[in-house]
Each structure stands twice: as C-alpha cells, then as structure tokens.
Design a protein with these regions (language model features):
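N-terminal leader/targeting segments and the immediate start of mature chains
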Residues: 1-43, 231-232
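The feature marks either
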Residues: 6-12, 24-26, 30, 52-56, ...
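Edge/loop elements at the starts and ends of beta-strands within beta-rich repeat scaffolds
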Residues: 22-30, 42-45, 52, 70, ...
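Extended beta-sheet lipid-handling architectures
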Residues: 29-34, 46-49, 63-65, 72-74, ...
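An acidic-aromatic
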Residues: 58-106
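Hydrophobic, well-structured mid-protein blocks that either form specific transmembrane helices
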Residues: 96-139
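Gly/Pro-enriched, hydrophobic low-complexity segments
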Residues: 125-232
C-alpha cells in the first residue's frame, strides 16, 4: 500500500500476505501470445508462442506452425518437437531439473501469473520494506534452502522471488519488471527467470502480448507417431 505522499505504508505481515491473495488473478481461462528469449551461455534463441490456460487444469503452449507443442496438466508434462522428432511424457522432474527447484502444476501456474510459488498462508514470515517493496522471509526456512519474496506495494503481486540452495550452489530468481492492467486486474507484462548453478546460467525472458481472459479455449495435442522419446 502506498500513502498519498508516495511512501510505502507500514503494514503487518499478516495484512501484506492477505492483500497478496486478495489480489490473486481471478480467471477461468487465459489466451495470449508470449515472446520468449532464451540464453544458456551456449546458445541464444528468440521465438513466439501461443498460450492457452485453464485455471488449475491445463497449460498449453504452441510455437509457430505447431513445430513445438507443450501440454501441462496437474498429472503430467507432455511436449513434442517436430524439428528433431522427439517427445517427452512424464512428471514434473524435467522442468524441475531445468530450473533447479521442485515444481508442480500449481507452482508453474503461479510463476506465470505473478503469484508466490509457495503458499504464504502456510508459514510464518518476517516482513520489512526493501527498495520500496514488501520483503518477506520465512521465520524458519528449510535447511539449505532460503527464500525471499518481494511484493509490489501497489497491487501486492510478486515483484521478485528468490529460491537459493546454498549447499548445491543453486539460485533461482524470478523477476516481474512490469505489470499491465487487463479488465481491472494486474497481470505480468514481463517475466525474467534466471537459473544459476556452478559454471552454468540460464536466462529466460518472457513478454506477454494480447492477453485475454475467460474465452473458450481448446488444447489440441497429439504426439506424432515415430518420434523418439526423451528419457531423463
């Protein structure tokens, strides 16, 4: 919350968390475009994806000409790549390994819409005002696993979330540099994901375009025959 003088108001930790969930995005479906830039230090790529999402049920991504398709449900992750005739069908371990932290459907959905990855209501947090944002850190964090959540004082959506595994020298930082207002709700305009390990850094930048809510959406997905399965 910002005062009339432009200062960030002092709020209790309880009220900060309450406002975060009070401002959770309300939607049944999402449709739009993503411009994605990928850089892992060895290669750089830029591409556009179509996005369709049904709350708590499905996330669907498709590249131009359906060359790559991704279909995520709470039960499994599936994708295929027509460029190299490969496919994957399995649990969330592939995405978790890629970003260096344990993920499930709810966490992936939260990441995309600007919610905290973890349920802030299930723990006790300390809060301070840091760089004009509300900073939350758990009073008791997981062993060898540190977390930080920065919430924007205007709409209480996530500005940054950091997950650090010092024992494994892993750091996942998810930034939300800008939000846009769509039908009266704050929705990310940009997301920047940085996954760092020893001698390895992967950066993914996402720009949302033409986002609409609550349209009828379909999720066409069928793995072509003859493709080689990716095993992990």
């Amino acid at each position: 919350m910002v005062t009339s003088s432009g200062e960030v108001a002092n709020l209790s930790t309880k009220n900060i968390i309450k406002n975060h969930y009070r401002n959770t995005l309300k939607f049944k479906t999402i449709r739009g475009k993503l411009k994605v830039m990928f850089d892992d230090g060895k290669r750089q790529e830029s591409f556009t994806l179509s996005l369709r999402m049904k709350k708590d049920e499905a996330i669907w991504l498709s590249a131009t000409l359906s060359l790559v398709k991704v279909y995520i449900t709470p039960q499994k992750v599936s994708f295929y790549n027509k460029l190299d005739n490969t496919y994957f069908e399995g649990d969330f371990s592939l995405i978790s390994k890629f970003l260096g932290t344990e993920l499930d459907f709810e966490k992936v959905q939260n990441l995309l819409i600007g919610n905290a990855l973890f349920d802030l209501k299930n723990e006790r947090f300390n809060s301070v005002i840091q760089n004009k944002n509300y900073a939350l850190t758990p009073k008791r964090d997981f062993e060898l696993f540190k977390r930080l959540f920065l919430l924007d004082p205007f709409h209480f959506k996530v500005k940054q979330q950091r997950l650090e595994q010092s024992g494994k020298n892993r750091l996942l930082t998810i930034d939300y540099p800008a939000y846009q207002e769509i039908t009266g709700q704050a929705f990310p305009k940009n997301v920047e994901i940085k996954a760092e390990e020893v001698n390895k850094k992967t950066t993914i930048q996402i720009e949302y375009r033409k986002i609409t809510f609550n349209e009828n959406v379909r999720f066409p997905f069928k793995i072509p025959s003859g493709y080689k399965e990716i095993k992990i």
